[in-house]
Amino acid sequence: MKQFRGTTILSVRRNGKVVIGGDGQVSMGSTIMKANARKVRRLYNGKVIAGFAGGTADAFTLFERFESKLEKHSGNLTRAAVELAKDWRTDRILRRLEALLTVADSKASLIITGLGDVIEPEQSLMAIGSGGSFAQAAAKALLENTKLSARKIVEKALTIAADICIYTNLNFTIEELDSES
């Protein structure tokens, strides 16, 4: 069976805001199966935003697990991410899930992988998915050379990625939180 693939998720932190945005395209092989999937959402009573790249069903399973870890650890993003990564790597069923998560709260931004990695970006941005490198390059240029807001940078960088990556469309979901940095 062909795998569902491709997406672009981008997170930017700037001027007291953290924004995660993603496109809405779900592709299977060379066919667009859905154009308006919601790959970015709010968790933990709206205090955390998260985006996923990879299998949709896998991502929803991981969102549920991550939210339960947030509840268990009183909203501590880093602790919840580490605990999810440990489970994801060691659980026989979870280990088969194919997705990447980007998560952010007011203090931190992280990428969580199925290999057990929890990665905090060195700069104010992170990107995943098939169009992630295009969006990241565009966002980096915009961060360094403009005074645009985090939201505008996400919008413009996702648009650039959609112009380049065939697995990324222009139907964006964007969530924003106030940030301490």
Curated annotation (Swiss-Prot):
Superkingdom of source: Bacteria
What's a GO biological-process term for it? proteolysis involved in protein catabolic process
Q: Name one Pfam family in it.
A: Proteasome
Activity control: Allosterically activated by HslU binding.
Q: What class of enzyme is it?
A: hydrolase
Q: What is its EC number?
A: 3.4.25.2
Location comes to: Cytoplasm
Which residues are involved in binding Na(+)? A162, C165, T168
Which function does this protein serve?
Answer: Protease subunit of a proteasome-like degradation complex believed to be a general protein degrading machinery.
Question: What family does the database annotate?
Answer: Belongs to the peptidase T1B family. HslV subfamily.
Q: What is this protein called?
A: ATP-dependent protease subunit HslV
Source organism per UniProt: Coxiella burnetii (strain RSA 331 / Henzerling II)
Corresponding gene? hslV
